[in-house]
């Protein structure tokens, strides 16, 4: 099981080109709704906020209602799936012509490049007004730019974080880890607590497993090296990637993730941490919102501390390097019948959800649009302070 876990970490990491953002096949049988006799059109929009407890899903629905009110000739039909199922479905749809999709949630940089190269997504340059351009945060669009064209606008950025349950650390007599060696030492002490997994991995969902390796690779190679690899300037052959793999194996060998890490997915790992059954979780900044809003959680949010990914003493990474950035957004299917309407909604929903992500303590908006900071939770503010130290 441990060997299979590592294989999954490495396979997912390579398949997604490590998905750092610092920096299926088959034919679709989906059908577009088309234009009605009264001139109303329906845009089919897909995203991966499928959980009703996710505040962003609610904010998306509010934004859609507002858009339909202001644009009575446009109706929005939404399809949602959990992240892994969503990725599989989208890839299958775009193996064909994806006629049943007008606007969809996706990931930029290397992930979207395959769709761009295949002519599957539409550039938005013709629909970007000077006013829209002026509201986008400087430096927030690089993951959406290909060959001088902009294929999406930013939504929000995120920050990979090590979340720690300080109460469990105190019970185990463990130090909050600032280095990899301290992380290993903490794992050994946390294992003495009955019924507690030192680090919840959620490895049944591949992207969760990949996060562990990505975190270590960032510290071994450094942000500059990783970005050079992602941009094609360097091969995936730096010795640091091998060292990160070896450190991942060591964490598996000392049972950091429990006895059978492949049995738990993302939701299981989140629940384990939120209910005091796991002492650590490596996750994006959006998890801060989960800790405060998940009704099933029993943990006291004040027990949780947000930390940087631990440093590696002889690695090339710097303490200001971080994994995250602006990479997730909505895109337009190049095969849509309603290019102008789809582009306008895409730009609109990216801005609305960017602001919503910040106001809910999930991410950092890619827009200068004023946001309400009055309800930001203390854990998210900790992450905000960590981000301010980053590059």
Regions found by a protein language model. Give the residues of each.
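Hinge/lid segment of periplasmic solute-binding proteins
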Residues: 107-160, 184, 212, 240, ...
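Conserved N-terminal structural module of periplasmic/extracytoplasmic solute-binding proteins
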Residues: 11, 25-113, 117-118, 176, ...
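Extracytoplasmic/periplasmic solute-binding protein
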Residues: 147, 151-155, 160, 184-233
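Extracytoplasmic/periplasmic substrate-recognition and gating elements
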Residues: 70, 171, 254, 295-361
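Sec-dependent N-terminal signal peptides of Gram-positive bacterial secreted proteins and lipoproteins
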Residues: 2-27
